[in-house]
Amino acid sequence: MARTIAELPKGSRITDYISIGVISKSFPLDKVNQILQSTGKTSQRQRELPAHVVIYYVLALALFMQVSYREVLRCLLEGIDWLSAPGTRTKVTGKSGISQARTRLGSGPVKELHDAVVKPIAGRDTRGAWYRRWRLVTLDGSTMETADNHENEAAFGRPGASRGRSGYPQIRFASLVENGTHVLFGTQLAG
């Protein structure tokens, strides 16, 4: 499943739409580091892409699915450089470095971060979120196409289609959705 846009339209930057501050406020660095520690995925040495940056990178990829991996990383690092001490500059690594960093990290820390942070957020005054003292949630499910490789096909399979099999392996998921805010939580993935 290819990403179709190599970069954002001219005159716009990813940081114009969302800043590193929004991601880091929703997923605080302390919580990210705590989860990296508990999963044994902290960076053992200083790398171009430390583990906490890779976590934020994966989050940014989910937000900007049509933009190339390298462009998402460049814009993310631009935000990190802006927040860092003057004169420090983070280099955008090559494609193989990005892939190696994501492989080193694995899915465990991202799943654990999701489970720790993504929770229902409705207050008692949120319209449509409560019935008397009970929080209202809906069960929803869907599928998402994933990269066309042997590992994903073995893990998730390919659904049938009118002429054979579908073009991509698909992840099936079910999630609780908080009425009133539409926050998905308690998500479970399956093949």
Residue ranges and their predicted role:
Residues 1-191:
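Conserved, well-structured functional cores that handle cations and Mg-NTP chemistry
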